[in-house]
């Protein structure tokens, strides 16, 4: 499966889930065959206000790559800023606008 320039070995993804998709969970999913894992939902507002708990959600390891980072928010300017902040944190950025 190919998403943009990202080539994945299979179509198995681990969905972004608040309170679930932390680093240990993602590592387990990778060990069990997930080609792509997602971060927990990360608040654009939390990044804007530089919240430690929000920043901690961005912790990752090489062995879980490729990693998708999911951002959520409802203010376009803050979402744009959040995208810039997490650009190097994963191979894919997913925007949750709902």
Language-model segment annotations:
Residues 1-2, 6-12:
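Extreme N-terminal starter segment of soluble prokaryotic enzymes
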Residues 91-98:
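Short, flexible active-site-proximal loops enriched in glycine and acidic residues
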Residues 1-2, 17-91:
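Glycine-rich, positively charged N-terminal anion/phosphate-binding segment
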């Amino acid at each position: 499966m190919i998403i943009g320039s990202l080539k994945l070995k299979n179509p198995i993804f681990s969905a972004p889930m608040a309170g679930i998709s932390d680093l240990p969970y993602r590592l387990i999913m990778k060990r069990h065959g997930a080609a792509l894992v997602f971060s927990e939902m990360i608040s654009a507002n939390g990044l804007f206000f530089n919240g430690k708990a929000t920043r901690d959600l961005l912790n990752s390891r090489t062995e879980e790559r490729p990693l998708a980072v999911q951002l959520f928010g409802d203010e376009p300017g803050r979402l744009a800023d959040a995208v810039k902040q997490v650009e190097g944190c994963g191979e894919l950025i997913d925007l949750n606008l709902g």
